[in-house]
Amino acid sequence: MHAPREKLSRHTLALHHAISSLMEELEAVDWYRQRADDCEDDELREILLHNMREEIEHAMMTLEWLRRNDGDFAEQIKTYLFTEGPITEVEESATGGGDETGGGGEGGGGDGLTIGRMKKRR
């Protein structure tokens, strides 16, 4: 933790536990996949891949808990997961295309905070 535990709300502590667990599950997925790639025994490789898939299941259960218990996670998951097309264009689509009247440019009246355009207009 980066702040004294006694200063954190119960909600923040619960989120911390979930986020820490999610990180650990994803790290375990990586380890099992690497071990499976490096393994020369077919039966052991299948066991390692089975274990990896279980860790993915645990990670997704934790991600779902985060979605259900935190509005910020819920909003981002709704925006980015299970979408089609280029991932980097999803935000533009979700915020009205990032034009001057939407939420993605300078002086726009959108409901999101922006820092304006990164490139000068020509």
Label the model's feature ranges.
Residues 1-122:
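Iron-associated oxidoreductase/ferritin-like identity signal
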